[in-house]
């Protein structure tokens, strides 16, 4: 899964004092046919809505739909490698799938820290994902920071 961002992986853990409410980060991910097929194999989801163009068109979709849970898989990588400091443990993730997305779409992830507890090292993050300027996903996560390796 090739998450595209300008910065490299976090090599050094962030100091908890640098993780502030309002801190935002953006990432993008292209949903390639290869990534789509890898997720199909991994998940075992062979539903025709994701894999049969005739079925999709009959149901008024222009193309095969992307797998919604590919978004949460990308979030797992973002939390574990990039943001807010890498090496986080996801304690909770809410998911609201608002609109479909398709193979070859580029998903734009915007994450914003909305709560930080420096004592417990727990942060809350709101996430919004867009494709072609449409919101396709929003959610809320609670992460336990594990800032030291």
List each language-model region with its residue ranges.
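HotDog/MaoC-like acyl-thioester-processing domains
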Residues: 1-24, 28, 101-149
């Amino acid at each position: 899964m090739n998450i595209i961002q300008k910065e490299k992986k976090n090599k050094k853990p962030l100091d908890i004092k640098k993780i502030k409410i309002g801190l935002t980060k953006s990432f993008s991910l292209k949903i390639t046919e290869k990534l789509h097929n890898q997720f199909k194999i991994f998940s075992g989801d062979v539903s025709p809505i994701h894999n049969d163009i005739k079925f999709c068109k009959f149901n008024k979709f222009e193309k095969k739909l992307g797998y919604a849970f590919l978004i949460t898989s990308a979030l797992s990588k973002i939390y574990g490698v990039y943001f807010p400091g890498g090496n986080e443990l996801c304690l909770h993730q809410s998911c609201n799938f608002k609109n479909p997305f398709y193979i070859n779409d580029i998903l734009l992830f915007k994450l914003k820290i909305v709560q930080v507890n420096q004592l417990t090292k727990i942060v809350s993050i709101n996430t919004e994902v867009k494709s072609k300027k449409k919101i396709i996903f929003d959610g809320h996560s609670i992460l336990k920071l594990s800032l030291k390796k």
